[in-house]
């Protein structure tokens, strides 16, 4: 039974999304429907957690807007996500960055991962 579910879910997985990690700064472009109109809204911030795997995979992005912390959780393979851009790679040692919730300003920054 498990193999059947995995086979069905594998067909619906998206392959056009980049491979990002915890601590990366990403721009998530989300389709927003308001009445009959549809537009694309961008949400930029730091990835503080990734959860589950397969079709049910989600990730949470955090940013500070007007002095107030805003977190938004997105389903990875949902059709409402138009695209994801990685703006900066982060260097972290934790799988979940919940400690960023308590920090403000420069203390809430994640070190940048330098690639050669």
Swiss-Prot record:
GO cellular component: cytosolic large ribosomal subunit
Gene Ontology molecular-function annotations: structural constituent of ribosome
InterPro entries per the UniProt record, alphabetical: Ribosomal_bL19, Ribosomal_bL19_CS, Ribosomal_bL19_sf, Translation_prot_SH3-like_sf
Lineage: superkingdom: Bacteria
Segment forming the signal sequence: none
Keywords in alphabetical order: Ribonucleoprotein, Ribosomal protein
GO BP, one annotated term: translation
A Pfam entry, by short name: Ribosomal_L19
Function: This protein is located at the 30S-50S ribosomal subunit interface and may play a role in the structure and function of the aminoacyl-tRNA binding site.
Protein family membership: Belongs to the bacterial ribosomal protein bL19 family.
HAMAP family (UniProt xref): Ribosomal_bL19
Protein name per UniProt: Large ribosomal subunit protein bL19
Gene this chain is encoded by: rplS
């Amino acid at each position: 039974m498990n193999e059947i579910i995995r086979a069905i879910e594998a067909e619906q997985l998206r392959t056009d999304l980049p491979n990002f990690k915890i601590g990366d700064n990403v721009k998530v472009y989300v389709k927003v429907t308001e009445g009959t109109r549809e537009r694309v809204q961008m949400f930029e911030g730091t990835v503080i957690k990734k959860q589950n795997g397969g079709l049910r995979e989600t990730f949470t992005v955090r940013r500070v807007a007007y002095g107030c912390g805003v977190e938004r959780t997105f389903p990875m393979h949902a059709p409402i996500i138009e695209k994801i851009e990685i703006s900066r790679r982060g260097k972290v040692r934790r799988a979940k960055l919940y400690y960023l919730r308590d920090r403000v300003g420069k203390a809430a920054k994640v070190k940048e991962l330098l690639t050669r």
